[in-house]
UniProtKB/Swiss-Prot annotation:
Protein name from the UniProt record: Putative cytochrome P450 132
One Pfam family hit: p450
GO MF terms held by the record: heme binding; iron ion binding; monooxygenase activity; oxidoreductase activity, acting on paired donors, with incorporation or reduction of molecular oxygen
Names of the cofactor(s): heme
Organism name: Mycobacterium bovis (strain ATCC BAA-935 / AF2122/97)
Encoding gene (name): cyp132
InterPro entries for the chain: Cyt_P450, Cyt_P450_CS, Cyt_P450_E_grp-I, Cyt_P450_sf, Cytochrome_P450_Monoox
Cysteine pairings via disulfide bonds: none
Top-level taxonomic group: Bacteria
């Protein structure tokens, strides 16, 4: 991998955007994965702009991204993009930094190692099979809501060995309202529309439960609902200990059981939320794209019939479902749940001759990178074969569905295994077509979601 240093030739001059334009659109539009606010960043590998007095650099060349996430990673930390996550889930693997992050990540790595995850396949399959069995042939339903409930049941069963109860039914509404409020809060912090001290104080108030007025009160109420739910899960385990090697027991026994209760709560809530939200979105986009591409779907159904027939999948089957896996990878390229990430420079840096001053927020528009024709020929075409051909000249940071660098999502193997199982089990019994009159609309909050769901009709095979 080539490095992004001053010794390499420039890929081109930095594009500069109007401060007034970017500030106005940050206030009025917010995030937009398409042609709006971030759409203006297309057409250049590096773009400089200011927003309400804060410096930003957007980088969309994989070499530049590689530099920030790998080569010069010690010069960059998580930005205010993660403020709403801190407000809800406190200090955790998503929001922590430095030695504390490394220590906590190390304590949890073995839980998400492939050899351990293979033993969770049965625990993943049970809730997926239950949801599939409850589907009504010919009935129209919102696949996104179904995926939220399914992925939450999988997380509850496989990682917590518990039933989340009523939270499963209410999570779709909680997540939708919470993410929309979080996007507005993030807009104030990330784009510099509010002084950082004020922003950080609001984050602390939401997290600590200090009474706040609307609309912050709604986000706080959602946080308190989730707080009660996850504390109930922890209390139940403490009252009725088990010998299972699930995530909750790992959290409670980490470092000899000396993690503070609040840290256990924060990590458990993070895995509950992040463990279902991004996967639910990824699966919703998968079913949407498969409905639009019947040839790819038919190829997948043939593979499933050949490998599985109608029997229950096993861990050994997962590696045999190459086309199914490629379809999931391509859908994550086309609509990446994690569609943008940001880092803040804590030291001066140089990227390919471009100076990055300390305090600059570096934006990585994953959605744009995933649709760059230099790395993905004919990028608007759904082509799972890209992931079977695997050209050797594609940069490693041209594909970032789980982020990259040492901060890459710890649960990526868990998520991929879960997605393959969902695609396989549900497709053994049903095909899903878009409901008449349905049109998708993207909603770019902290994650990329279908704004009005994905309305489908399931037809029994």
């Amino acid at each position: 991998m080539a490095t992004a240093t001053t010794q390499r030739p420039l890929k081109g001059p930095a594009k500069r955007m109007s401060t007034w334009t970017m500030t106005r659109e940050a206030i009025t539009i917010g995030f937009d994965a398409g042609d709006g606010f971030l759409g203006r960043l297309r057409g250049s590998d590096i773009t400089r702009f200011r927003c309400a007095g804060r410096r930003f650099v957007s980088i969309s060349h994989p070499d530049y991204v590689d530099h920030v996430l790998h080569e010069a990673r010690l010069k960059y930390v998580k930005s205010d993009e993660y403020g709403p996550i801190r407000a809800t889930a406190g200090l955790n693997l998503l929001t922590d930094e430095g030695d504390s992050w490394a220590r906590h990540r190390g304590a949890l790595n073995s839980t998400f190692a492939r050899r351990h995850l293979r033993g969770l396949v049965g625990l993943m399959i049970d809730p997926i099979a239950d949801v599939t069995a409850a589907l009504v042939p010919g009935a129209q339903f919102d696949m996104h809501q179904s995926m939220v409930e399914t992925t939450l049941r999988v997380v509850a069963n496989a990682l917590f060995s518990q039933d989340f109860g009523p939270l499963v039914q209410s999570m779709h509404d909680l997540a939708t309202r919470g993410l929309r409020r979080a996007e507005k809060l993030e807009r104030l912090g990330l784009w510099g529309l509010m002084p950082r001290t004020v922003y950080d104080t609001l984050i602390w108030c939401i997290y600590s439960g200090v009474h706040l007025p609307p609309p912050l009160r709604e986000m706080q109420e959602i946080t308190l609902t989730l707080d009660r739910a996850i504390n109930s899960v922890i209390d139940r385990r403490l009252a009725e200990p088990t010998n299972s090697a699930d995530l909750l027991n790992v959290l409670l026994s980490a470092d000899g059981g000396i993690w503070p209760r609040q840290r256990v709560r924060d990590e458990a809530l993070t895995f509950m939320l992040a463990g279902h939200e991004t996967t639910a979105n990824a699966m919703s986009w998968f079913w949407y794209l498969m409905a639009l591409n019947p040839q790819a779907r038919d190829h997948m159904l043939t593979e499933l019939d050949d490998v599985l027939g109608m029997r229950r999948p096993t861990a050994d089957d997962l590696g045999k479902l190459a086309w199914t896996t490629a379809c999931l990878q391509e859908s994550q390229r086309y609509f990446s749940s994690v569609w943008i990430i940001a880092r803040e420079a804590v030291d001066d840096d140089i990227i390919d001759g471009h100076r990055i001053r300390r305090g600059t927020t570096v934006v990585i528009p994953i959605h744009h990178i995933h649709h760059d024709p230099r790395w993905w020929p004919d990028p608007d075409r759904f082509d799972p074969g890209r992931f079977l051909r695997c050209p050797t000249d594609r940069p490693r940071c041209a594909y970032l569905p789980f982020g990259g660098g040492r901060r890459i999502c710890i649960g990526q193997s868990f998520a991929l295994m879960e997605m393959v199982l969902m695609a396989a089990i549900m497709s053994q019994h049903f095909t899903f077509d878009l409901a008449p009159g349905y049109h998708v609309e993207l909603e770019a909050t902290l994650t990329l979601r279908p704004k009005h769901g994905v309305h489908v009709i399931g037809r029994r095979r």
